[in-house]
A protein has these predicted regions:
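Flexible, solvent-exposed coil segments and beta strand-coil junctions
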Residues: 40-44
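Extended, low-polarity transmembrane helix blocks
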Residues: 1-34, 45-60, 66-124
Length: 124
C-alpha cells in the first residue's frame, strides 16, 4: 500500500477517501429515506435500486481508495458516482429560491473540486 507515495499524497488520498466514506455511511444509515423520496419526486425510476447501487459504488470506491488498491479504478468509480449524484441532487437551475439555489451551486462546486482531486489521484 502507498508505495512510492509522498506523505502528502497519502494524506490527500486518505482525506478524499474519508470524505466519501463519511458521507456514504451517514447517508446510508440516516438519510436513506430522505434521498429515496427526493429521487422519487424527481421521477427517477426504481429510485431505491438506483440509490442502493449508488451507495455501494460510493462505499466500495472509497474503501479501494483508502486501501490504495486499484487506485485508478477507485478514482473512476468515485468520479462516476460524483457526476451522477450531482446531476440528481444538485439541479440548481430548477430551484427558484436564491439562497437554496446558491447552496446547490456551492455543493456542485465542491463536487467539482472532489473530481479534480480524483483526477490527480488517478494520475499518480
Amino acid at each position: 500500500m502507498y508505495e512510492k507515495h509522498s506523505a502528502l499524497q497519502v494524506v490527500g488520498q486518505l482525506l478524499l477517501a474519508a470524505a466519501y466514506l463519511a458521507t456514504g455511511i451517514r447517508n446510508t444509515l440516516w438519510k436513506f429515506g430522505q434521498h429515496e423520496e427526493r429521487m422519487k419526486a424527481l421521477g427517477i425510476p426504481q429510485a431505491r435500486t438506483v440509490l442502493v447501487a449508488g451507495f455501494i459504488l460510493q462505499l466500495a470506491g472509497a474503501a479501494l481508495l483508502a486501501l490504495d488498491y486499484q487506485r485508478v479504478v477507485a478514482a473512476w468509480l468515485l468520479g462516476a458516482f460524483t457526476i451522477l449524484a450531482s446531476l440528481i441532487f444538485h439541479r440548481w437551475w430548477l430551484i427558484p429560491d436564491p439562497l437554496i439555489r446558491h447552496l446547490h451551486i456551492s455543493n456542485l462546486l465542491v463536487n467539482l473540486g472532489l473530481l479534480g482531486g480524483l483526477a490527480l489521484i488517478a494520475a499518480i
